[in-house]
Amino acid sequence: GCAFQVGEQCFNIGRLVTFLSDLDIRVPGMTVDRWCGSSMEAIHIAAGKIAMGSGKAFICGGVESMTRVKTGFDPLPYPYSDKEKQNPNLYLSMGITAENVAKKYNISRTEQQEFALESHRKANEAQQKEKFVGEITKIDNCETDENIRPNSTMEKLDSLKLAFDQNGTVT
């Protein structure tokens, strides 16, 4: 999965990965672009192919590095069509989607923060018990998920600024 196929993550990176990994040249590769759901969609495609018997094993994952996408990058290399201009909600970021879900289901900022705090607590506990060892491939001495915040508190979460809608709830 890779939504912004630029720089070294362009030109069908899924195929390049199979080639650069010294897999047999007959091993196919493909890149899936479903924006924030690209990696998950790749997994769903592989699961579907296994279920219907068109393969036994697949390598799936996300290869996108947002630091490789230049600020101001326009993912649409062509001018917006009239139909796209008339439908501004066609491409919503995950942040705006989160705001919409929170609004639709009346999920307060406090509820979101409580969920986040518990999520980090559980993730930290699992990491301490080495539950993720088989899930993380060691790269350049990185053996753990550095995004888990074991010292997070409600006070720290309360101090975060709203990120997407100044009248919203998502930080």
Q: What does each model-identified segment do?
A:
Residues 2-55, 89-96, 151-171:
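Conserved catalytic cysteine-centered active-site region
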Residues 1-3, 141-142:
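A short beta-alpha structural unit
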Residues 15, 99, 124:
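Short glycine-/small-residue-rich flexible loop motifs, especially phosphate/cofactor-binding loops
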Residues 9-10, 69-71, 144-145, 152:
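Short, well-ordered secondary-structure micro-motifs
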Residues 47, 51-101:
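Flexible glycine-/small-residue-enriched beta->alpha junction loops
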Residues 6, 65-67, 123:
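Glycine-rich nucleotide phosphate-binding loop and flanking beta-alpha elements
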Residues 32-63, 102-129:
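Active-site-proximal alpha-helical scaffold in enzymes
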Residues 111-171:
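N-terminal extracellular/periplasmic Venus flytrap/periplasmic-binding protein-like
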